[in-house]
Amino acid sequence: MNIQALLSEKVSQALIAAGAPADCEPQVRQSAKAQFGDYQANGVMAIAKKLGMPPRQFAEQALAHLDLTGIAAKTEIAGPGFINIFLDPAFLAKNIEAAVASDRAGVEKVSAPQTIVVDYSAPNVAKEMHVGHVRSTIIGDASVRTLEFLGHKVIRANHVGDWGTQFGMLIAYLEKQQQENAGEMALSDLEGFYREAKKHYDEDEAFAERARSYVVKLQGGDEYCREMWRKLVDITMTQNQITYQRLNVTLTRDDVMGESLYNPMLPGIVADLKAKGLAVESEGATVVFLDEFKNKEGEPMGVIIQKKDGGYLYTTTDIACAKYRYETLHADRVLYYIDSRQHQHLMQAWTIVRKAGYVPESVPLEHHMFGMMLGKDGKPFKTRAGGTIKLSELLDEALDRARRLVAGKNPDMPADELEKLANAVGIGAVKYADLSKSRTTDYIFDWDNMLAFEGNTAPYMQYAYTRVLSVFRKAGVKESELTAPVVIQDDREAQLAARLLQFEETLGVVARDGTPHVMCAYLYDLAGLFSGFYEHCPILTAETDALRQSRLKLALLTAKTLKLGLDTLGIETVERM
């Protein structure tokens, strides 16, 4: 049930009947305060201005045409021309009834599902995942889960860094150390190898030359180099898969679409861009000059797509990647969860993609950028020694802290149940702390805040869910035994009911904008409204059995909505805490 969409359609019809153009924007929004109703139509003033009419006069004309019979109890004009809409309790009750009967809490699947490619996580081969991968992985996965829940076909694309000069270095150094069987190495060994290989590459010109030759051999399909490369990729992705499972992230080995996938396309891309007059030779390199981007001198910026030595760049790969996602994967929309520092690079690649006609304008390419994870000192989150924090170590600490926290509250809980609860709380806390912040801003990583049982945190939300379940346990009834109709009488019942019915709208915003913090805010607000309802509207001691059943249905739908909402975020729920 999408009330906002229903009201937008009705208000639109009224505005057009009052003289507004057919493409007018009703701007129906959820009201910020109960005194302004459940929804407000804010588009009147802009339309009235275009028509040269006083806004209130136009609002009155529109209101005369607005038929919300069976939907709104009343409508009113506020301020300079806002239309406030108060939903009818009978309308709320009818739709709550339908939502309770639905295993999707009343959320309908989209009528026109799209094929959506979501590019996220993208760790590098031969390196262990670190905290810098957290935001892309967690936010991207929440986006994927939301889109799939709404009925879209989602293609996960893990654009791993599995190509480039680093492989020449690694293969050369492994050979030097006679460590040809890379398959037996743990990833931590590979990280040590990487550091040593880089040191040799920087300090030993002969070694660097050999490393570069191995890159050429690898690109040329040399079997020995390819075999070593495959081992490096395999070790890395096996380790990453363990991390994904710990994080409750849906990525699998089948979702790996690394940089190497696009290698065969690169010569053709360069040749085609030359043939189309987009790419030219400049100082031995192949360059695309873009009027849309200026250098310091105010001249069109040159984007290199092939170096003097014949090597390709990340831009070339990203051009091929976008082309592949449209032509081969048949994407209707492509979302990239990549940090904000890559914005100009992506914009340049996509400008070339559009000019070359590889992806039509009708297929959005969206950079869902995000800020950095900071320590309490406001600087990038690092170890005390200033090093990068491994993701596995961060998750270990989350589990340790959560284990101590839940053991303190549940001293008699069996060990296996305690471990399961600690995992749900610890991993959930790390994820929710990230997801509950706007992705476009930096955020402070703070263990005490994220593991608190108060405020907009995972432990609070998980506890809120168990609290609703406990009402049912105390009631001693099954869902199938709730046969009395839903009735909405008290204001707190109405507020909770209206918020429950806004679940689909909230999912729609997250799907459109890639903003899981909107879902976190919704669920936190919902939990707060349930608390107010629970305190002021007796459930188990309601005046009549019919009222008791009605309120139990509201509690049931709250539990369903909290669970489904947290699931779209990848946050586990538990039965008791």
From Swiss-Prot:
CDD domains: Anticodon_Ia_Arg (cd07956), ArgRS_core (cd00671). PROSITE patterns: AA_TRNA_LIGASE_I. Its main location: cytoplasm. Keywords: Aminoacyl-tRNA synthetase, ATP-binding, Cytoplasm, Ligase, Nucleotide-binding, Protein biosynthesis. One of its GO terms (cellular component) is cytoplasm. Its EC number is 6.1.1.19. It is found in: Cytoplasm. It comes from the Bacteria. Monomer. GO terms for molecular function: arginine-tRNA ligase activity; ATP binding. The gene is argS. Belongs to the class-I aminoacyl-tRNA synthetase family. One of its GO terms (biological process) is arginyl-tRNA aminoacylation. This is Arginine--tRNA ligase. It holds the Pfam family tRNA-synt_1d. It comes from Cronobacter sakazakii (strain ATCC BAA-894). The lineage of its organism: Bacteria, Pseudomonadati, Pseudomonadota, Gammaproteobacteria, Enterobacterales. It catalyses: tRNA(Arg) + L-arginine + ATP = L-arginyl-tRNA(Arg) + AMP + diphosphate. A motif ('HIGH' region) lies at residues 123-133.
